[in-house]
Amino acid sequence: MSKLDTTKSKIAFKEAQKYMPGGVNSPVRAFKNVGGDPLFIDHGKDEYIYDIDGNKYIDYVLSWGPLILGHADDHVVAELDKAVAKGTSYGAPTLQETELAKIVNKIMPSIEMIRMVSSGTEATMSAIRLARGYTHRKKIVKFVGNYHGHSDSLLVDAGSGLATFGINTSPGVPDDLAYDTLTVAYNDVAGVKKLFAEHGDEIACAIVEPVAGNMGVIPGTQEFLQTLRNVTNEHGALLIFDEVMSGFRAAYHGVQSLVNITPDLTTLGKVIGGGLPVGAFGGRREIMENITPAGDIYHAGTLSGNPLAMTGGISTLEQLTPDDYVEMDKKVTALTEGIKHAADQYGVPMTVHHVGTMWSYFYNSDPINNFDDVKACDQKLFEKCFWELLAHGVYVAPSQFETNFISTKHTDEDIEKTIAAFDAAFNAATK
């Protein structure tokens, strides 16, 4: 195995574990899925990150998706500098909130009204409460391997960190909450029809990642997503597209524009904060007007819509154009095709997926359509190759259940270097 000096990161991690559970504030950062200690990052610029040992990496994690303009984008940083000089938070309305709401509405017209929050978890949790209050029903439908944050109702059969650690749900989630969460395999059209035939009049909503991003990148099929739209309409349930990850990532106008399906509600996050803590949920006006203070379904948040997160979102989205997504898609296509070609040269079983700026690779040559397919992939090979990639200056997600991303700052040269790093990793792993 190639050598990488991470002495300072190892010391920092040992110290962190004295004061924080597992030494981190989000479990996937701990590198447990790849059998080693995490890198501690000093700074980032454009498509690169630099650890505290001085190692430089081409970054495809990008803070788990938000940094579509790369690290420390000059315009975003300049706008944040101006905003923070005025004050970090007021607990009162600001012009930035309305400005970002208008930008989101223009790009994603299905979001007629929006409520800003501080995380993706808060966005999905609040959207579920709104759906239950609006329909006067309790049960919700989610899909195995889809991750919608860590609120209790949505931790059943989830992806992301739960998948990384092999956990089905979490201790502390009451059985009665799990009872009201109905689960179906992702992309299982027959399963969806059967579930709604049996429970349709009890279901408040179905929440789905239209492109799953928390078990690697797995697109929802057109038939699957259209079936969801049809059965929710038939039974008076709401359809929620969780685009916290895929929004402004899979496509400029969201996955809903790719599949030509309009959900009742959409959840957002990540990119719309430009790297600051943020989330949002929105949709049809007649539904959203039930949120307090316009209606009686409660939501509040001390830092919801805070001026720094709003500025981060505005200064990010105002720079992006549909043409940027065409260019990024070309680069991801070249990258994933190059990785697959390198894998084939060494007889490494591999399937690659990408949608827009999101991409992932699976150490399995069989079709990957759901969570069970992902779990059948070669974890040991993933682990070996991960460390080889790091040693060659490429930072990818430290779990086969997570998504990688690209930014506007990644260059053709970065793509070539990354493919070469994968080639070297496959060579080392197959010796």
Swiss-Prot record:
Entry's Gene Ontology cellular component terms: cytoplasm
Complexes and interactors: Homodimer.
Enzyme class, spelled out: isomerase
Pfam families named in the record: Aminotran_3
Entry's family note: Belongs to the class-III pyridoxal-phosphate-dependent aminotransferase family. HemL subfamily.
Main location: cytoplasm
Modified residues (N6-(pyridoxal phosphate)lysine): K270
Any one GO molecular-function label of the UniProt entry: pyridoxal phosphate binding
Protein name: Glutamate-1-semialdehyde 2,1-aminomutase
Organism: Limosilactobacillus reuteri (strain DSM 20016)
Keywords: Cytoplasm, Isomerase, Porphyrin biosynthesis, Pyridoxal phosphate
Catalytic activity: (S)-4-amino-5-oxopentanoate = 5-aminolevulinate
Enzyme Commission identifier(s): 5.4.3.8
Keyword Cytoplasm attributed: yes
Keyword rRNA-binding: no
BP GO annotations: protoporphyrinogen IX biosynthetic process
Cofactor dependence: pyridoxal 5'-phosphate
Record pathway: Porphyrin-containing compound metabolism; protoporphyrin-IX biosynthesis; 5-aminolevulinate from L-glutamyl-tRNA(Glu): step 2/2
Top-level taxonomic group: Bacteria
Subcellular location(s) per record: Cytoplasm
UniProt lineage: Bacteria, Bacillati, Bacillota, Bacilli, Lactobacillales
